């Protein structure tokens, strides 16, 4: 396993001794870690909902024959794969020799621009292959030993309460979620549950006017009772919503998108386009979460042997083109210097294809980390297909990187958490 930096630092990273070497010293800063300005930094989480098929996303070229043996009908033909060794010749002939699905040309370009890290076999110790349980485990930051280890708070919410305590409550939302009508458990703090605004189904420009039209006179006093406490919570939440709505509306109207960013007409592109406009408009929101659904590809993942068009083909195209346009947008000026994106999927897929040109629920999957602060490279090695047998239902179970390691690296080294 090659020791390749994930983020370039000129001094020792805060996560040293906590994380594997591939996740230590991970961001490319020009100044020493102690002098970094963290104030404007933001992360953008892209949820690939449904369980992305990592083996058809990041193709393991060093064990390609084993891959084809497990997937005779749905494998990506080698002639179509985008080999990363064409960019980094050090990968060729090693157990890190990988290629990208042909519809990930945007991600391939980011790798070429030194802005994409690929992390292999991301997961957690006690894998749960329920969509609902696994995404809750990811959002709460736990190991999967039970549904959520007794936690009812999320890692984002706890991070915000601990690291940005002086900003709570504030005049802008600490988090903005788009793409899912259910607000993510990840944004729930131990004490605060109103840290994020969910814009799903909303027009950001008119968000404030919609909310403000619902407001009236708040009561000045509350009964000293359970009812009074609940009423005060509702009033406080409504007041915060109006404040947040004003901040979102102002930022959206003040912001703009780079005219040269070629956003496609897709749902994910619209979500990321909104994020870029809000950031350029000056809002100080720290964490954005967007969503691309449809990755539960039990059938018609491909059309058939040799024809990789199908559900997964279209999803990866939507992901890649949206991310490439977003990066073109934010990198057109200095705001891109302070943005890191990360893909998250609740689990991967089985090594073996099923009988419906698809794949069933698996465990580990690769993650993409991208942005100007990121150093291109590969962390981890290609999977060992010999562990996928009938006795374990053809699962790849070996976790190379606990998802919490990736999150901890970003929070500590990029956002400056302690």
Model feature map: region roles:
Residues 354-358, 362:
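Histidine/acidic-residue-rich catalytic or RNA/ligand-binding cores of hydrolases
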Residues 285-287, 336-338, 344, 362-365:
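Active-site lining segments that contact anionic ligands and/or coordinate catalytic metals
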Residues 2-321, 325-332, 352, 366-418:
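Feature for exported/extracytoplasmic and membrane-associated proteins, marking the mature portion
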């Amino acid at each position: 396993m090659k020791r390749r930096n994930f983020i370039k630092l000129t001094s020792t990273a805060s996560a040293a001794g906590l994380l594997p070497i591939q996740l230590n010293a991970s961001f490319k800063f020009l100044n020493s870690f102690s002098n970094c300005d963290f104030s404007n930094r933001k992360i953008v989480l892209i949820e690939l909902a449904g369980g992305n098929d990592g083996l058809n996303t990041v193709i393991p070229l060093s064990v390609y024959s084993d891959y084809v043996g497990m997937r005779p009908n749905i494998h990506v033909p080698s002639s179509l794969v985008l080999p990363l060794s064409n960019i980094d010749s050090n990968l060729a002939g090693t157990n890190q020799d990988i290629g990208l699905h042909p519809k990930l040309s945007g991600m391939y370009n980011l790798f070429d621009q030194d802005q994409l890290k690929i992390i292999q076999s991301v997961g957690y110790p006690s894998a749960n292959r329920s969509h609902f349980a696994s995404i809750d485990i990811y959002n709460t930051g736990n190991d999967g030993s039970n549904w959520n280890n007794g936690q009812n708070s999320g890692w984002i919410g706890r991070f915000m309460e601990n690291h940005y305590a002086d900003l709570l409550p504030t005049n802008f939302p600490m988090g903005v979620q788009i793409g899912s009508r259910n607000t993510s458990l990840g944004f729930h703090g131990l004490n605060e549950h109103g840290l994020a605004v969910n814009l799903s189904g909303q027009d950001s420009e008119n968000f404030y006017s919609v909310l403000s039209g619902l407001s009236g006179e708040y009561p000045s006093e509350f009964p000293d009772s359970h009812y009074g406490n609940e009423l005060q919570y509702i009033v406080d939440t409504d007041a915060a919503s109006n404040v947040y709505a004003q901040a979102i509306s102002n930022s959206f109207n003040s912001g703009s998108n780079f005219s040269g960013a070629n956003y496609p007409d897709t749902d994910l592109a619209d979500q990321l386009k909104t994020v870029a406009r809000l950031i350029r408009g000056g809002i100080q929101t720290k964490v954005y979460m967007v969503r691309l659904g449809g990755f539960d590809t039990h059938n018609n993942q491909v059309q058939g042997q040799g024809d990789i068009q199908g559900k997964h083909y279209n999803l990866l195209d939507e992901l890649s083109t949206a991310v490439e346009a977003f990066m073109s947008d934010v990198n057109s000026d200095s705001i891109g210097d302070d943005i890191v994106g990360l893909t998250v999927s609740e689990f991967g897929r089985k090594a073996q294809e099923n009988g419906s040109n698809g794949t069933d629920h698996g465990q580990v999957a690769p993650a993409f980390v991208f942005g100007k602060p990121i150093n291109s490279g590969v962390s981890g090695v290609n999977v060992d297909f010999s562990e996928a047998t009938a006795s374990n239902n053809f699962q790849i179970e070996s976790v190379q990187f606990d998802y919490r390691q990736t999150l901890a690296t970003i929070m500590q080294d990029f956002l400056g958490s302690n």
